[in-house]
Amino acid sequence: MTLKSLFFLLLGLIITVLLDQAIKYWITHTMLLGTEIPLFPFISLYHVRNSGIAFSFFSSFSHWGLIALTITIIVFLFWLWKNTELDKALSRFGIVLIIGGAIGNLIDRIRFQAVTDYILFYIDGVFSFAIFNLADTFITLGAISILIDEFCIWIKTKRHLDKSK
């Protein structure tokens, strides 16, 4: 692990966690639970608390069980980041996004025994997506970054193998 990569890890974590927590602070201090502020015909701010993980999975787990699970995942992700080759920059960036999102949601879980969610996508009377937050978005974008990186490596390897035939 180089000093430069450690710097970018810490910078990425600081940015993701601060952005997530700043928005959640604003939501919790300006909106009552259960209130909605329509922004566009398809998106609203809708203040809720989620006692589970993504899409309310594991909501039957105990509060401390979810905290322990989240910490375990964060520790594993730090190990994964440390052991991912430096040339896999997109994967390493994705792992940082996932860790930052997990830490942001962990802070909520410790403070409120639930995660503050507030983004609602919907088509009036037709479709409503699960309510989520910026930390969830970071986690999703991080996973997509890793998948894209792995897919590009697979394509590159496949082309190399095809040329060697």
Swiss-Prot record:
One of its GO terms (molecular function) is aspartic-type endopeptidase activity. Keywords: Aspartyl protease, Cell inner membrane, Cell membrane, Hydrolase, Membrane, Protease, Transmembrane, Transmembrane helix. It is a multi-pass membrane protein. The chain crosses the membrane at residues 7-27, 28-48, 61-81, 87-107, 128-148. It catalyses: Release of signal peptides from bacterial membrane prolipoproteins. Hydrolyzes -Xaa-Yaa-Zaa-|-(S,diacylglyceryl)Cys-, in which Xaa is hydrophobic (preferably Leu), and Yaa (Ala or Ser) and Zaa (Gly or Ala) have small, neutral side chains. Belongs to the peptidase A8 family. Pathway: Protein modification; lipoprotein biosynthesis (signal peptide cleavage). The keyword Aminoacyl-tRNA synthetase does not apply. InterPro entries: Peptidase_A8. One of its GO terms (cellular component) is plasma membrane. GO terms for biological process: proteolysis. This is Lipoprotein signal peptidase. Its main location: membrane. The gene is lspA. It comes from the Bacteria. PANTHER family: LIPOPROTEIN SIGNAL PEPTIDASE. It comes from Bartonella bacilliformis (strain ATCC 35685 / KC583 / Herrer 020/F12,63). The active site is at residues 117, 136. Its EC number is 3.4.23.36. This protein specifically catalyzes the removal of signal peptides from prolipoproteins. The keyword Nucleus does not apply.
